[in-house]
């Protein structure tokens, strides 16, 4: 059997079909193709001459009927800055309804009551769903370092006639159904310019490492019992492999030729929205309560602008602990830093603010527009064309050393002392006896501590 005749069989079950022409109109397939595939269905003894399902067909529907669903909601949603500092992305409200609640209701509407939500980041905020919607929660404790491959591996044992659903989608029309006959992966109908996915004429999903013309993937998938077992086997076998730490679970659907082992399900792109960024949420629902974050209010107040004048918000990956983002306001680019959780124990924000106050107007660092010493929020003007020093470039090093000497000779002073070696001891004390994640830590530490006597000798200068 193939996708075409299975689609026709499903239509025959769900619609009162009188003739082939009606079946062609409803399916979108040509009349010639419908006639050919209908003949095949009758040869397989699945449909009789009057478009009635046989007992064999009813058994097939029963075998593949949806049983449960898994909603993936463990990740940070890093691109959702600044919203993700307050709310996990599954709970973002669109049209006064959290995304995940809408998905749960759509699943329940087709009879799916066995729903498991895989949580991680801000997992406590999802707990109310257990009481309100009788869903189950599974925890991915590695959500901070690993991708959703591990989220699905957490629930590999329950996969079988299962919908797998990302939590960051808003679907105008439900993509779920009471009947399914084959495994599928959801993509948009519209051809887009930049995609790693393409549906070919054979109704196959082909993936590529390079972006090109193709279809937009939406992440929703249905797995029959047979295909779910194959996926679960791969998830469990590969879970311990480091190469999959950043993998999406969909790699388990690819064969050796980068072709998916499941069929495509195409949906009108105008009826489904993936919300990965603040801008996408604003585009879908300008009145969403989650657009009013503390960070955006701080920007509005500091720059004297309205929320709508803050545009082109873009996450910045740089920084070990901070959640920073780039934005534009009235043609000027800025960076806002939102300190990561727990960093107030590592950095004295009031001392940091004192340093920036002393540096103000000296053209030594970035231009600080706003700084809050209580919560560490900082807005700076974006430096276009700036780059880090190339430690392998002699000319770069000479310029940097000259700048450091100039800075040192300016003899700027603050009211506190920063002892780098004591800070190193303090940071390492937070490990509670555990060794460093970095293999060359001991070697680097030896080199740094080797400078201590030199620094101590000249620090008075």
Q: What does each of the following model-derived ranges do?
A:
Residues 42-51:
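A short, conserved structural fragment
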């Amino acid at each position: 059997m193939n996708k075409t005749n299975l689609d026709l069989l499903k239509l025959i079950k769900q619609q009162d079909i009188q003739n082939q022409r009606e079946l062609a109109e409803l399916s979108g397939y040509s009349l010639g193709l419908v006639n050919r595939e209908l003949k095949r269905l009758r040869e397989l003894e699945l449909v009789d001459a009057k478009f009635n399902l046989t007992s064999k067909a009813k058994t097939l529907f029963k075998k593949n009927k949806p049983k449960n669903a898994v909603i993936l909601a463990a990740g940070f949603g890093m691109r959702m800055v600044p919203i993700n500092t307050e709310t996990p992305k599954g709970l973002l409200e669109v049209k006064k309804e959290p995304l995940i609640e809408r998905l749960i209701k759509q699943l329940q509407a087709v009879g799916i009551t066995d729903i498991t939500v895989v949580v991680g980041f801000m997992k406590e905020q999802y707990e109310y769903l257990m009481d309100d919607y009788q869903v189950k929660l599974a925890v991915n404790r590695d959500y901070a370092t690993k991708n959703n491959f591990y989220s699905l591996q957490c629930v590999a044992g329950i996969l079988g006639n299962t919908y797998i659903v990302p939590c960051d989608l808003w679907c105008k029309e439900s993509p779920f159904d009471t009947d399914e006959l084959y495994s599928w992966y959801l993509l948009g109908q519209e051809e887009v310019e930049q995609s790693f996915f393409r549906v070919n004429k054979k109704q196959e999903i082909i993936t590529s490492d390079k972006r090109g013309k193709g279809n937009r993937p939406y992440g929703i998938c249905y797995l029959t019992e047979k295909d779910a077992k194959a996926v679960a086997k791969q998830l469990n076998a590969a879970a311990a492999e480091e190469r999959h730490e950043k993998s999406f679970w969909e790699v388990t659907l690819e064969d050796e030729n980068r072709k998916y082992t499941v069929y495509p399900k195409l949906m009108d792109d105008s009826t489904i929205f993936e919300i990965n960024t603040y801008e996408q949420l604003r585009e879908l629902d300008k009145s969403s309560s989650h657009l009013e974050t503390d960070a955006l209010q701080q920007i509005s107040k500091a720059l004297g602008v309205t929320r709508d004048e803050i545009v082109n918000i873009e996450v910045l990956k740089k920084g070990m602990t901070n959640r920073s983002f780039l934005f534009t306001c009235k043609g000027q680019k800025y960076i806002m830093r939102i300190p990561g959780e727990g960093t107030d124990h590592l950095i004295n924000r009031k001392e940091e603010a004192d340093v920036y106050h002393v540096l103000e107007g000296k053209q030594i660092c970035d231009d600080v527009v706003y700084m809050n010493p209580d919560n560490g929020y900082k807005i700076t003007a974006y430096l276009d064309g700036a780059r880090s020093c190339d430690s392998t470039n002699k000319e770069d090093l000479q310029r940097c050393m000259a700048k450091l000497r100039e800075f040192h000779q300016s003899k700027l002073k603050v009211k506190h002392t920063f002892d780098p070696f004591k800070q190193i001891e303090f940071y390492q004390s937070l490990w509670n006896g555990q060794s460093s994640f970095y293999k060359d830590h001991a070697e680097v530490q030896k080199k740094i501590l080797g400078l201590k006597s030199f620094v101590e000798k000249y620090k008075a200068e």
